[in-house]
Regions:
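Residues lining hydrophobic/aromatic ligand-binding pockets adjacent to catalytic sites
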Residues: 1-235
């Protein structure tokens, strides 16, 4: 299954090309979910979501919609995965409503660029994560891109986050029964979009779910690209 969207939805500048011109801000997510079937939430990086907030998200989206969420910075940037059992359990517990509704996609653990590879640290942290919750790791230091790290991810069914970066080339390696793409360029040519669709199609052919998120911008290109990708996959 392909889940495609952007890293956010609250952008008035997406009117009228993505949202109808008269769409009020409180209806953005509801309209977004009629065109795309997933979104990546960065809000959770700084704050734990309240039950009221999650209930609103759930009510605004249809069955089959998925919210992928960025793990809280206390886990990834303050503790840097070390001695983070209590924080991780608390964070995952805060997502319980999404889990119960069947709308939790993937939890993204985005590590700081100065954090170098530490296989023992990663192994210990992976041991904290419940198998029922999909996890992906965005490594932003190239020392992490080793077979030892890939093996640890495979053993935990955790995905290597395939994130675009001007400073780093992430190897296109599958380590789980799903893949996770963070596409950060502001624009993609028709040829690039076609190549991307072929890559995603190959993953789907191997029965891997694909979570694909374009960069959020004040203009709607990313959302439109995601919609095009869904149409290609369906077609």
């Amino acid at each position: 299954m392909l889940y495609a969207g952007t890293s956010g939805w609250a952008y008035p500048g997406w009117k009228p090309d993505f949202y109808p011109a008269k769409t009020p801000a409180k209806k953005f997510l509801e309209v977004y979910a009629t065109r795309l079937n997933s979104v990546e939430v960065n809000y959770t990086f700084r704050r734990y979501p309240s039950e009221k907030l999650l209930a609103g998200w759930i009510a605004s989206t249809p069955a089959g919609f998925r919210f992928s969420v960025k793990a809280n910075q206390l886990i990834t940037h303050i503790k840097r995965l070390r001695d983070a059992r209590e924080l991780t359990q608390r964070f995952l517990s805060s997502l319980q409503l999404l889990t119960e509704a069947g709308k939790l996609g993937v939890v993204l653990y985005q590590l700081p660029p100065f954090l170098k590879a530490d296989a023992a640290l990663l192994s210990d942290f992976l041991g904290l994560l419940p198998a029922a919750v999909r996890s992906t790791f965005e490594f932003r230091h190239d020392s992490w891109f080793t077979e030892e790290v890939f093996t640890l991810l495979r053993q935990a069914n955790a995905a290597l986050c395939l994130a675009e970066s001007e400073k780093l080339v992430v190897p296109d390696v599958s380590t789980a029964n799903f893949v996770y793409y963070r596409l950060r360029k502001p624009e993609y040519s028709a040829a690039e979009r076609r190549q991307l669709a072929e890559r995603i199609g190959a993953q789907l052919a191997h029965e891997r779910d694909a979570f694909v998120y374009f960069k959020h911008e004040e203009t709607p290109e990313g959302a439109l690209y995601a919609g095009e990708l869904i149409q290609r996959a369906a077609g």
